[in-house]
Amino acid sequence: LEFNVCSSDLITRGTSREHFVRATLESLAYQTYDVLKAMEQELGEEINSMKVDGGASANNLLMQFQSDITGKSVIRPSVIETTGLGAAYLAGLATGYWKSKEKITENQSIDRQFDRQMPDNIVNNKLKGWKRAVRCAMVYADEE
């Protein structure tokens, strides 16, 4: 077991497995924030919303936190396992079952949209902590 000195002051005797689970979920949202910022910088324009899928998108806490941290609307479809669905749609297009991509789009529905609820000052403090943790981890990794 390796102990990272960057997080040693954040782990106490009161830290539970639930805290680790929450931190893991939140880290996904922070990483998404970093990727979105890089994409926006490369594109030269703002991304307003994200369409999500996959198993993690079923977690309402994660989706809300992701919207809070990124400031983007997070849109979850009714069917979250879209890999298989996409293959089925392509097969349907190839066989003529679906006449156009537009017909497929009409068939899709939104389960839920998450919009930012967290106040800016809290988001800014959380992002400051995330950036500090990333810098610390990078320094720690460089020392290895």
Where in the sequence are the language-model features?
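Short, small-residue-biased leader/transition segments that mark boundaries at the very start
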Residues: 1-7
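Glycine/Thr-rich phosphate-binding loops that ligate phosphate moieties of nucleotide
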Residues: 8-144
